[in-house]
C-alpha cells in the first residue's frame, strides 16, 4: 500500500487536522512553513544527525534479548534500546529536533509540557545545549510522582511550573502550555512531547522519532540476515515512540504492529488510559483523535501507574492505523506492567521504564503465541531509574496487603 499521510490539512484519514483558535493559527502555520523549509535544507538534517550521533549517542543498539526469549520459549525478542539515549529515553530525539528548529526560526524561549518528566528533561537538556530559556509545565500530581526529574529539569536551568488545574496531570499540563504559548507567541516555541496536537505537530514528532524505526529496520537485517521481523511492539500513551518505530514499516504489510495501552486497574473499571480500546473520536488539544469521554463528550480522567501513559487521547496517526486495521492496540494492566518491569530486570539486567514495561508485558504474551520460528522488535522506550522508588513502594504495599490477607 502507498502510505501518504497526512494530507495538506493535516488529516490522517479521518483523524488529525488543526482545531485551534485564531490566536494560535498564525503560530502553527508559521511552524509548518519553517518545518517545510528545514526539510528542504540538507544542512538542517546534517546538523541534526551530527547532534544525534555525538550528543545523544545514536544509533542505539538493537539487542537480541536471548535470556528473555529462552525464558519465554517463544518468538525471538529484539529490544530497540532507546533507554540508552542521553537523558534515558526516546524523548530527546524529538526535543533536540524541535529546539534546533526553534533556533532556526529565531525564537528565544522554549515551553513544553511533561508527564513522567522525560520529555521535560529532554527539552530542558536541548534548551541548555542551545542556550535558550525554558519553562516546563507539569501537573502537580506528576511533580510529586517524579520529584527526581523535577530536580533534573531545574538543574538544567529550566523553570518548572506545577499545574494545579483539573486532575493535575498530563492533559492539564498541555492545556497550561498551550495557554502560555498563546500569550507569548512572538518569541516562544512550544515543543509538544508526543505525536499529538494540531497539525503539523503529529507529523513533526513522527518524523523526528522515525529514526527509531529506520535504524531498527537496517539493524534487524544486519543482525539476522532476514529482511523483516514478524511483529513490532511499543507502548502507547500519546504514541511518539510507537509511531517512531511503526512508521518506517507501515508499507511492509507482513509486519504486524502492536501498541500496548495502559489498562490501569482494568478496562472495565474507570481507572485506565486505554484510549483505542474504550475511547471514541473527539477533539482534544487541537486534533481529532480517539478520546476517553463520557456520553456527553466530556473528557474522562485517564489513569495509569505510569505517569507517561495517563493521557486520555492518542496521536491521530495511531487512530488512523487502528481505523484502517494496520495496527492493533492492546490493553496492559498496571499489574502486568509491574511483572514486565521485574522480569526484564531479573533475566536481562535491564531496568525498563514503567511505560516500556507495558510493551514488555505484551511482548511476553505475543512471543508465546507466535512461537520460536517468529521474531519481533520491541521498543524499549526508556530506562526505569525514575520509577524504581515508585515500584519499590508499590511492591511493598502489595506484599503488606497479602500479609494481612493471610493473617
From Swiss-Prot:
Question: Which keywords has UniProt assigned to this entry?
Answer: Amino-acid biosynthesis, Aromatic amino acid biosynthesis, Lyase, Pyridoxal phosphate, Tryptophan biosynthesis
One GO MF term on file is:
tryptophan synthase activity
Q: What is its EC number?
A: 4.2.1.20
| One cellular component (GO) term of this entry | cytoplasm
Matches recorded under Pfam families? PALP
Q: What class of enzyme is it?
A: lyase
User: According to its UniProt record, in which pathway does this protein act?
Assistant: Amino-acid biosynthesis; L-tryptophan biosynthesis; L-tryptophan from chorismate: step 5/5
**Oxidoreductase: is it a keyword of this entry?**
no
Q: Which cofactor does it need?
A: pyridoxal 5'-phosphate
Residues recorded with modification N6-(pyridoxal phosphate)lysine: 91
Which InterPro entries does the annotation name? Trp_synth_b_CS, Trp_synth_beta, Trp_synth_beta/beta-like, TrpB-like_PALP, TrpB-like_PALP_sf
Instruction: Name the domain of life.
Output: Bacteria
Question: Reaction catalysed?
Answer: (1S,2R)-1-C-(indol-3-yl)glycerol 3-phosphate + L-serine = D-glyceraldehyde 3-phosphate + L-tryptophan + H2O
The answer to whether UniProt assigns keyword Lyase to this entry is yes
Q: Which HAMAP family match?
A: Trp_synth_beta
Give the record's family classification. Answer: Belongs to the TrpB family.
The family database entries (PANTHER family) matched by this protein are listed as:
TRYPTOPHAN SYNTHASE (PTHR48077:SF3), TRYPTOPHAN SYNTHASE-RELATED (PTHR48077)
Task: Give the multimer and partner information.
Answer: Tetramer of two alpha and two beta chains.
Role noted for this protein: The beta subunit is responsible for the synthesis of L-tryptophan from indole and L-serine.
Report what the protein is called. Tryptophan synthase beta chain
**Species whose genome carries this gene:** Streptococcus pneumoniae (strain JJA)
Amino acid at each position: 500500500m502507498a502510505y501518504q499521510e497526512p494530507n495538506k490539512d493535516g488529516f490522517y484519514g479521518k483523524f488529525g487536522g488543526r482545531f485551534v483558535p485564531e490566536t494560535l493559527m498564525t503560530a502553527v502555520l508559521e511552524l509548518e512553513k519553517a518545518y517545510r523549509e528545514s526539510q528542504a535544507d540538507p544542512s538542517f538534517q546534517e546538523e541534526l544527525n551530527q547532534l544525534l550521533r555525538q550528543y545523544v549517542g545514536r544509533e542505539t543498539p538493537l539487542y537480541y534479548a536471548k535470556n528473555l526469549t529462552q525464558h519465554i520459549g517463544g518468538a525471538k525478542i529484539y529490544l530497540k534500546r532507546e533507554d540508552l539515549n542521553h537523558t534515558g529515553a526516546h524523548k530527546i530525539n524529538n526535543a533536540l529536533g524541535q529546539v534546533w528548529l526553534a533556533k532556526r526560526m529565531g525564537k528565544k524561549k522554549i515551553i513544553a509540557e511533561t508527564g513522567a518528566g522525560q520529555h521535560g528533561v529532554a527539552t530542558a537538556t536541548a534548551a541548555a545545549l542551545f542556550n535558550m530559556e525554558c519553562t516546563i509545565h507539569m501537573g502537580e500530581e506528576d511533580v510529586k510522582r517524579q520529584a527526581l526529574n523535577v530536580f533534573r529539569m531545574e538543574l538544567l536551568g529550566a523553570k518548572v511550573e506545577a499545574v494545579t488545574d483539573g486532575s493535575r496531570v498530563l492533559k492539564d499540563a498541555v492545556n497550561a502550555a498551550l495557554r502560555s504559548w498563546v500569550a507569548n507567541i512572538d518569541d516562544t516555541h512550544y515543543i509538544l512531547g508526543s505525536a499529538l496536537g494540531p497539525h503539523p505537530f503529529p507529523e513533526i514528532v513522527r518524523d523526528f522519532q522515525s529514526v527509531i524505526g529506520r535504524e531498527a529496520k537496517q539493524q534487524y537485517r544486519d543482525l539476522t540476515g532476514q529482511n523483516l521481523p514478524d511483529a513490532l511492539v511499543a507502548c502507547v500513551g500519546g504514541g511518539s515512540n510507537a509511531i517512531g518505530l511503526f512508521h518506517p514499516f507501515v508499507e511492509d504489510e507482513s509486519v504486524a504492529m502492536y501498541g500496548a495501552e495502559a489498562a490501569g486497574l482494568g478496562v472495565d473499571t474507570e481507572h485506565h488510559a486505554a484510549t483505542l480500546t474504550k475511547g471514541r473520536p473527539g477533539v482534544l488539544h487541537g486534533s481529532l483523535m480517539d478520546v476517553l469521554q463520557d456520553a456527553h463528550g466530556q473528557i474522562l480522567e485517564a489513569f495509569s501507574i505510569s505517569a507517561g501513559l495517563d493521557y486520555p487521547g492518542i496521536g491521530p496517526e495511531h487512530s488512523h492505523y487502528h481505523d484502517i486495521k494496520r495496527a492493533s492496540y492492546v490493553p496492559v494492566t498496571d499489574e502486568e506492567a509491574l511483572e514486565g518491569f521485574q522480569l526484564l530486570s531479573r533475566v536481562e539486567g535491564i531496568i525498563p521504564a514503567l511505560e516500556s514495561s507495558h510493551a514488555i508485558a505484551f511482548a511476553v504474551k505475543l512471543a508465546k503465541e507466535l512461537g520460536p520460528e517468529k521474531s519481533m522488535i520491541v521498543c524499549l522506550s526508556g530506562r526505569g531509574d525514575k520509577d524504581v522508588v515508585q515500584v519499590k513502594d508499590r511492591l511493598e504495599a502489595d506484599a503488606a496487603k497479602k500479609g494481612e490477607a493471610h493473617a
